[in-house]
Amino acid sequence: SIVPDGGRTTTVTFQAGQSREVIDWLEERQGRQNIYFTVNPVMRPMSSKPKKIDIRGMQAIHVDVDPRVGEDLEAERERALRLLREFKPAPTVIIDSGGGFQGFWLLDQEQRTDGSEERAAELEAYNLQVEVLLQADACHNIDRIMHLPGTVNVPGAKKRKKLPKEALATV
């Protein structure tokens, strides 16, 4: 989780069977901090944001299409969602981050990197291609974090230019 406008960042890795811990952790932060998940699996439990060398492999191609600054927010959100829905092949999952939209194409099989930055760069090229085709945000890195659906996107002062109020991230 990240505190808007700076402050402490908290990173936790939860395992299957820790649903009570997850709920407690989320409730402590909901509406006060932005809560994220890593798109791709890590090699070990993390206590800080993972780097490329911490990523085990790619399980999804991803993209983030945000409204363009200076344009009408609702028209831009409609544009972003339309771009994703009309893209071929269609994303497996579309998340409304509360600002823009994130598209995920789940792979049939994880493409392993085992922390190799060279292999990560090869796989990031797929994200970059989708990013270019959709005129999306620069977020093609394999260690990317994205807003967790079901949590509130809390914009800080800088983000309020694009997202004037809090918004719930949804699938």
Question: Can you describe what each PLM-predicted range is?
Answer:
Residues 1-99, 107-125, 132:
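Signature for HUH/AEP ssDNA processing cores
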Residues 105-109, 149-150:
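Short, structured patches in soluble enzyme cores that scaffold and shape functional sites
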Residues 132-171:
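Catalytic "initiation/cleavage/transfer" segments centered on a nucleophilic residue
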